[in-house]
């Protein structure tokens, strides 16, 4: 099991435009062991951390049956989400979690 309180670096594998200020970020945890042991259920969220800026709670929107892929759909509305919106595929951010009760 992954320690949800540690920040785990993740690479943006794809940035998918959903609407003018909304993007889905397909993330991949950088550490192989963390990736292998990371599990979540529908309804949970991660704290998405941008180094030097802060963090924000974002729901995991990917399939729990594919835990090595972490998708988060983010609307650019505040300081942290606006900074995340500037990132592109290949860049790194941090993930803490998962948190919350699944369905």
Question: Residues of each region from the PLM?
Answer:
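Short, charged beta-turn/beta-strand-edge "cap" motif at the junction between a beta-strand
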Residues: 52-55, 97-102
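Ferredoxin-reductase
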Residues: 2-91
């Amino acid at each position: 099991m992954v320690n949800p309180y540690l920040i785990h670096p993740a690479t943006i594998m794809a940035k998918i435009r959903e609407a003018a200020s909304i993007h889905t970020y397909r993330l991949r945890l950088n550490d192989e062991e963390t990736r292998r042991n990371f599990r979540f259920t529908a309804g949970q969220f991660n704290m998405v951390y941008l180094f030097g800026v802060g963090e924000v709670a974002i729901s995991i929107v990917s399939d729990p049956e594919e835990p090595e892929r972490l998708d988060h759909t983010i609307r650019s509305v505040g300081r942290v989400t606006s900074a995340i919106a500037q990132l592109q595929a290949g860049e790194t951010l941090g993930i803490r979690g998962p948190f919350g009760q699944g369905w």
